[in-house]
């Protein structure tokens, strides 16, 4: 009889521990599945911003030659 009670207590303790761990890991997984995509989007946005900033710097560079304008001026000079 004593052995049956011990086994019953062990079974219930194991059942509670497994249920709690399943709930904890389930909540961690759901949080992770929500957070990971947002983290990846954040890093990709930073890369896009850096590329856009570089493009703007290239456009605003006063020493950059405008090749189309040079071609038009050469045509005008030849005519």
UniProtKB/Swiss-Prot annotation:
GO molecular function: toxin activity
Location(s) in or outside the cell: Secreted; Target cell membrane
Major subcellular location class: secreted
Keyword Secreted included in the entry's annotation: yes
The UniProt record lists the keyword Electron transport: no
GO cellular component terms given for this protein: extracellular region; membrane; other organism cell membrane
Entry keyword set: Antibiotic, Antimicrobial, Cytolysis, Fungicide, Hemolysis, Membrane, Secreted, Signal, Target cell membrane, Target membrane, Toxin
GO biological process terms, semicolon-separated: defense response to bacterium; defense response to fungus; killing of cells of another organism
Residues of the signal peptide: 1-23
Organ and tissue specificity: Expressed by the venom gland.
Residue numbers covered by the propeptide annotation in the UniProt entry: 49-79
Assigned protein family: Belongs to the non-disulfide-bridged peptide (NDBP) superfamily. Medium-length antimicrobial peptide (group 3) family. Ponericin-W subfamily.
Function: Antimicrobial peptide with potent activity against a range of Gram-positive and Gram-negative bacteria. Has high hemolytic activity against erythrocytes. May act by disrupting the integrity of the bacterial cell membrane.
Designated name of the protein: Ponericin-W-like 32.1
């Amino acid at each position: 009889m004593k052995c049956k009670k011990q086994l019953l207590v062990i079974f219930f303790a194991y059942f509670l521990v497994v249920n709690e761990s399943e709930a904890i890991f389930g909540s961690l997984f759901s949080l992770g599945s929500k957070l990971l995509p947002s983290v990846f989007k954040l890093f990709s946005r930073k890369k896009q911003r850096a590329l856009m900033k570089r493009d703007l710097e290239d456009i605003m560079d006063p020493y950059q030659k405008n090749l189309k304008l040079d071609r038009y001026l050469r045509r005008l000079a030849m005519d």
